[in-house]
Curated annotation (Swiss-Prot):
Chain residue ranges for the region called Disordered: 45-80
Record's protein name: Large ribosomal subunit protein uL4
Keyword check for rRNA-binding: yes
One GO cellular component term noted in the UniProt record for this chain: ribonucleoprotein complex
């Protein structure tokens, strides 16, 4: 698959870049995507939720009312789950939500997500760019020129670039990621994908089947 390369002014440079068909042109596997996104979101959970159960509360164990003769139900002590401020029955406990997936399945999910983007014409390739100093206005101008600023956009960079990162971090709907860290969730969470020429080379090399 070939895509045109644009400059930061949004103009077609006349150059073409090749996207590996084993990454960007496969038949997407929806179930693999589902599992990978489910794992990503599960791994983000802290799992620190906790509610005290009856044995963990401090308070008097004296019975509030006598066992029989009141005509009502037995109440027990002040920590009873039946009462406001009492214990929780089967309350949440701290737990680890993360789970493992096979590397091959995760790779298939990532290629499926990228193939969906390519199929829907939501991938743009630009020339490599840099800033001498952090310039949010300059980065915003690039998004405007490429017509991707109104919806969520993910810029894929070949390497860490502090000035580019600082220029983009305050822009709404704009995220940056390194080419070697692309994952299924991040790709699908954005409407458009903007790759630099060197990013394409990294993706083609690392993720080809």
């Amino acid at each position: 698959m070939e895509l045109s390369v644009y400059n930061i002014k949004g103009e077609d440079t006349g150059k073409k870049v090749v996207l590996d068909d084993s990454i960007f042109a496969i038949e997407p596997n929806d179930h693999a995507i589902y599992l990978d996104v489910k794992q990503y979101m599960a791994n983000q959970r802290q799992g620190t939720h906790k509610a005290k159960e009856r044995s963990e509360l401090s308070g008097s164990t004296r019975k509030l009312i006598r066992q029989k003769g009141s005509g009502g139900a037995r109440r027990g002590d002040i920590n009873s789950p039946l009462l406001s401020g009492g214990a929780r029955v089967f309350g949440p406990r701290p737990r680890n939500y993360s789970f493992k997936l096979n590397k091959k399945l995760k790779a298939l999910a990532r290629r499926s997500a990228l193939s969906y983007k390519a199929k829907n014409n939501e991938i743009i390739v630009v020339e490599d760019f840099n800033f001498d100093a952090p310039k949010t206005k300059a980065f915003k101008a690039i998004s405007a020129a490429l017509k991707v600023g109104e919806k969520k956009v993910l810029y894929v960079l070949p390497e860490v670039n502090k000035n580019v990162y600082l220029s983009a971090r305050n822009l709404p709907n704009t995220n940056l990621i390194l080419a070697n860290l692309i994952n299924t969730y991040t790709v699908l969470a954005s409407k458009n994908l903007v790759l630099t020429e060197r990013s394409v080379a990294v993706v083609n090399e690392l993720f080809k089947a």
